């Protein structure tokens, strides 16, 4: 699980973004994304991929996209 956040007090911005890869019951891989304001419930989206390699590539793309938008990695979950 990868945790990202973006905090900008001047713009009253406190956002989080979580990315996670999980296997499905049907042998596919799911990229789970959750985002929202820190301290509030967020929104979720799940994208399913036929192979782990494709899911990892999508995760890397999303991570680059978030880092370009000034999100900072705050830690990896267990």
Which residues does each predicted region cover?
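Disulfide-stabilized extracellular ectodomains of secreted/luminal proteins, especially beta-rich
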Residues: 1, 49, 54, 77-78
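Negatively charged, low-complexity tracts enriched in Asp/Glu with abundant Ser/Thr
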Residues: 1-12
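Solvent-exposed, flexible loop/coil residues
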Residues: 8, 30, 42, 53, ...
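Charged, amphipathic alpha-helical segments
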Residues: 12-18
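Short aromatic-glycine-(Arg/Gly/Cys) micro-motifs in beta-strand/loop hairpins
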Residues: 18-45, 60-61
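A short, charged, amphipathic alpha-helix used as a generic interaction element across diverse proteins
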Residues: 41, 49-68
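Short, mixed-charge low-complexity intrinsically disordered segments
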Residues: 65-78
